[in-house]
Amino acid sequence: MSNFSHAVKYNVISSQLARHYYQLKNRSLKQIVFVATTGRSGTMSLVDIFNHIPHCKAEHEPYPAMFDEVLKAKCAGNEAFVANMYWRIKSVNLWRAAAGYHHYFESNHLFIKTYIEYAVEDFKDKVTVIHLVRDPVKVANSIYALQDFPGTEEGNKWWLDYTAQNNLIKIANYLDNDPEFKHPFYKGLWYWYEIEERVKDWRKKLPHVRFLDFNTEDFNNQDKTFQLLRDLNIDFDESALTEYVNTRANTRPHQKLSPPLPLEQANKMHQNFKTLLSSLPI
């Protein structure tokens, strides 16, 4: 799409008209599901499962993903830019994608970082959030293997900027200068804990929104996975979904530039990090 066509399609008036049109086409929509997670946590497994259930639709990081310049604006406190991107572009695309379905799921770890408050205002009581949690050492090691941890050019597009003033866990001085904690693995650990703090914070700010807790490791457990779907009030045929449980998706082995740290070393560093956090007034 040319810049001119994009500007016409997503100007304020066009966006308002398009949103109203797609809202009318979403009369059958019962629920829109988002995920509050770090990424590297199994969200693609959920996408695969959702897309094999009648009247359900799932997409992974659909346009606009709200990353890069949107995430950087959020980290810099430029809320006007983020709000404009949501209401002018993101909202329309969400309503369009959900049209014709009973349940729509967006798998996007940028949700908790850039646009949760706008999505809740937009979809109101239709919103459910899955708080998807993977072991912090596994998440940090996965990010470390990709070598795109916070602080790198690519990492700041997708994860978070550990130097941002609006972080809940402000330890940039340690991550930059401490002989122990300036190892890049710690930036992945910081990211995991920062996301968890943000989830806690949003749960307090949005007490009317339903959050469902789920562990990534439980995707290997058919009973727990099916219970999650029941908790989402989704009708499904267990026999039709059995083959999609226990599968791994989006492991990105071709993008991993470094071997992960040995588990013993990673666990020791995690313990060091927890000791640091416990000593700080966070």
Descriptions of predicted regions:
Residues 44-47, 65-68, 112-115, 136-142, ...:
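Short catalytic/ligand-binding loop motif for oxyanion handling, primarily in non-cytosolic enzymes
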Residues 48-123, 154-159, 163-180, 272:
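PAPS-dependent sulfation machinery
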Residues 1-26, 168-188, 193-282:
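PAPS-dependent sulfotransferases, especially Golgi type II membrane carbohydrate sulfotransferases
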Residues 123-145:
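Conserved phosphate-donor/acceptor-positioning beta-strand/loop module used by diverse small-molecule
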Residues 36-38, 105-110, 133-134, 215-217:
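Short His-Asn-centered micro-motif
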Residues 33, 57, 128-130, 212-214:
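Hydrophobic/aromatic beta-strand patches that form the interior of the parallel beta-sheet core
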Residues 1-99, 240, 244-256:
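PAPS-dependent sulfotransferase catalytic core
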Residues 75-78, 146-150, 231-232:
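Short, hinge-like loop/turn segments at secondary-structure boundaries
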